[in-house]
């Protein structure tokens, strides 16, 4: 049974608030469907939780929206505030509650990921964390992308590591093994344990433990030399030289090179803050990490503390430095210091330098944070100009925050697909992209109908909203956040503007589909024709008068081109799969199920063609007789 939000159930709220203990601990706020919205901690739970529901207490719009959805609050009492901090950090890390996300990793900043859950882990750059892969280890986010790529490239030259996600050949190693770049993991030429030991040494570089790594490699080199294994000793020597080259350009910028420090500073402007972390190890700058934060309801001390809690809860204890220099005094400086010391099992000091060389370093980090802030502000300003101009072109009431664009791709009706791309605040939001296979039986090889295809896609996209309205739901109230069911109904993806790639015909078919859904009065929809870059709006014959180079048109073209790229990529993928299947369809005795098994097992026609008889016959669900037919089809001169 779904619970009613507490603010609409005064009796239940009053009873709950009376019984809250005034002990330290954590509180977990949940919605009506028991989804976790927010995790918080407090030295006095009663005072903190009551503050959310106290009349006259001015809450930020974000927190106010959250409180309207809270239907249940779970309390966990701890012995002290330090335990509450540790528990809060673990809960946020495990559940990633929506309203806890104060920090935003800029998607331009990449991480280094090591997939420790794999038998032979990979190491690669990524801009997105894989939430379901709990054994993955991430380092970053790094600000200097070019330097990071160069570092990883050099590391893969120094240490033989897995180079490919999918093996190039099924039955033999590739050239990377022959030239010493890969230890032959595809054929298991190296044990998983030995390979992971190599990767642990690479991990030490990203942990800032290069001094330890040097000592380890020097001992190994001496051991190889004493055992007369001169080739192995030479390989380790090359690794040592390579590690030195990685950091030879770094300057000694702190007097005491024996101390490991992280320096954290920020720059703020309007409602956004840029936060930078400089990682100093043995006097060398080994990494620059960056975050962006919404600072509309938080002061500098709160943001810096949130950075520290967020960052150090995601690293191994060995990566926590003995000293952290911060730009401003933290809200709970002693508490955070004790928390980090407990994790590291060694004293961690958090200091605010006022003078001397340390203060100069803080100024340097602040300067870099400000440069990143100006970069992101320039991008936002450009997007705002484009969105504002588009609003004027289309005579919209408000600037469109979420814009969706749709395109159809096919060749004479074959492999017909559609794309949905989404721009939020003028920036591509790839996590919201969708692809559609056209299901209409009328669309087939030799017969295409872009109008019908587009109508089908729009109908499928908005049928949840149509059902909500048919059941008596008020879309306008929902979108204005006057209803607490916004997330509960999973109706949080309403676009402010829909753009159709096409002319008046495509637009008319979409409008007809929306009329059938009874959504035509709620949705802003336009089309952009390719030939003359004309913009059409519903029920108006003539295109709008625009200039090709005005900002709003540039945004529309960028959106349209992205939709076209996404659609044609999916179409080519589907066509390639069909062509593979069509070749296998020519083999007697192979039905759809066995073709699917073959492609899943061997991944390509080429691999099936090169497979030996024993490999084919051992494929699950195939059998010896079918393996004979396949082998004879591809190698008629060597009939079995």
From Swiss-Prot:
One of its GO terms (cellular component) is excinuclease repair complex. It comes from the Bacteria. Gene3D superfamilies: 5' to 3' exonuclease, C-terminal subdomain, GIY-YIG endonuclease, UvrC, RNAse H endonuclease domain. SUPFAM superfamilies: C-terminal UvrC-binding domain of UvrB, GIY-YIG endonuclease, RuvA domain 2-like. It comes from Prochlorococcus marinus (strain NATL2A). InterPro entries: GIY-YIG_endonuc (IPR000305), GIY-YIG_endonuc_sf (IPR035901), GIY-YIG_UvrC_Cho (IPR047296), Hlx-hairpin-Hlx_DNA-bd_motif (IPR003583), RuvA_2-like (IPR010994), UVR_dom (IPR001943), UVR_dom_sf (IPR036876), UvrABC_protein_C (IPR050066). HAMAP family: UvrC. This is UvrABC system protein C. It is found in: Cytoplasm. PROSITE patterns: GIY_YIG, UVR, UVRC. Residues 22-101 form the GIY-YIG domain. GO terms for molecular function: DNA binding; excinuclease ABC activity. Keywords: Cytoplasm, DNA damage, DNA excision, DNA repair, Excision nuclease, SOS response. NCBIfam families: PRK00558.1-5, uvrC. Belongs to the UvrC family. One of its GO terms (biological process) is SOS response.
């Amino acid at each position: 049974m779904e619970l009613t939000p507490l603010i609409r159930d005064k009796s239940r709220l009053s009873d709950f608030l009376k019984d809250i203990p005034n002990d330290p601990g954590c509180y977990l706020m949940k919605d009506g469907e028991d989804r976790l919205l927010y995790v918080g901690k407090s030295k006095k739970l009663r005072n903190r939780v009551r503050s959310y529901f106290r009349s006259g207490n001015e809450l930020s719009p974000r927190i106010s929206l959250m409180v309207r959805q809270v239907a249940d609050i779970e309390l966990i009492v701890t012995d002290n505030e330090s335990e509450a901090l540790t528990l809060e950090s673990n809960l946020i890390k495990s559940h990633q509650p929506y309203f806890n996300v104060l920090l935003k990793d800029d998607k331009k900043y990449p991480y280094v990921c090591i997939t420790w859950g794999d038998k032979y882990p990979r190491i690669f750059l990524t801009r997105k964390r894989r939430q379901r892969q709990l054994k993955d280890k991430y380092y970053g986010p790094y600000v200097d992308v070019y330097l990071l790529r160069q570092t990883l490239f050099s590391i893969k030259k120094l240490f033989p590591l897995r180079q490919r996600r999918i093996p190039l050949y099924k039955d033999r190693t590739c050239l990377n093994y022959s030239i010493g770049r890969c230890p032959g993991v595809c054929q298991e030429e190296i044990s998983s344990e030995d390979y992971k030991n190599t990767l642990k040494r690479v991990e030490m570089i990203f942990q800032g433990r290069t001094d330890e790594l040097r000592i380890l490699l020097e001992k190994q080199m001496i051991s190889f030399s004493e055992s007369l294994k001169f080739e192995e000793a030479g390989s380790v020597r090359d690794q040592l030289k390579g590690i030195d080259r990685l950091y030879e350009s770094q300057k000694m910028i702190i007097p005491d090179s024996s101390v490991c420090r992280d320096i954290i500073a920020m720059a703020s402007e309007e409602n956004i803050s840029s936060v930078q972390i400089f990682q100093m190890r043995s006097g060398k700058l080994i990494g620059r990490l960056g975050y962006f934060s919404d600072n509309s309801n938080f002061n500098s001390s709160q943001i810096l503390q949130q950075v520290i809690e967020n960052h150090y809860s995601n690293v191994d204890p060995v990566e926590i430095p003995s000293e952290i220099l911060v730009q401003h005094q933290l809200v709970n400086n002693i508490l955070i210091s004790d928390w980090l010391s407990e994790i590291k099992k060694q004293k961690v000091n958090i200091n605010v330098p006022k003078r001397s060389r340390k203060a100069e370093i803080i100024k340097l980090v602040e300067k870099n944070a400000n440069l990143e802030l100006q970069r992101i502000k320039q991008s936002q300003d450009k997007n705002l100009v484009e969105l504002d101009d588009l609003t004027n072109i289309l005579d919209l009431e408000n600037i469109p925050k979420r814009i969706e664009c749709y395109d159809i791709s096919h060749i004479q009706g074959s492999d017909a697909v559609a794309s949905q791309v989404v721009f939020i605040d003028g920036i591509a939001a790839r996590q919201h992209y969708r692809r559609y296979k056209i299901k209409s039986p009328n669309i087939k090889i030799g017969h295409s109908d872009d109008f019908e295809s587009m109508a089908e896609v729009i109908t499928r996209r908005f049928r949840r909203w149509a059902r909500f309205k048919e059941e008596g739901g008020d879309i306008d109230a929902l979108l204005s956040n006057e209803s607490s069911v916004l997330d509960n109904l999973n109706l949080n993806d309403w676009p402010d503007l829909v753009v159709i790639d096409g002319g008046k015909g495509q637009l008319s078919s979409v409008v007809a589909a929306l009329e059938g859904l009874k959504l035509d009065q709620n949705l802003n929809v336009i089309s952009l024709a390719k030939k003359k870059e004309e913009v059409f709006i519903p029920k108006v014959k003539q295109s709008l008068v625009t200039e090709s180079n005005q900002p709003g048109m540039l945004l529309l073209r960028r959106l349209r081109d992205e939709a076209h790229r996404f659609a044609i990529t999916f179409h080519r993928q589907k066509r390639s799969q069909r062509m593979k299947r069509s070749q296998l369809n020519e083999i007697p005795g192979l039905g759809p199920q066995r073709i699917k098994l073959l492609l899943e097992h061997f991944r390509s026609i080429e691999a099936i063609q090169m497979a030996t008889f024993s490999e084919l016959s051992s494929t699950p669900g195939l059998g010896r007789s079918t393996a004979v037919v396949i082998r004879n089809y591809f190698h008629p001169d060597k009939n079995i």
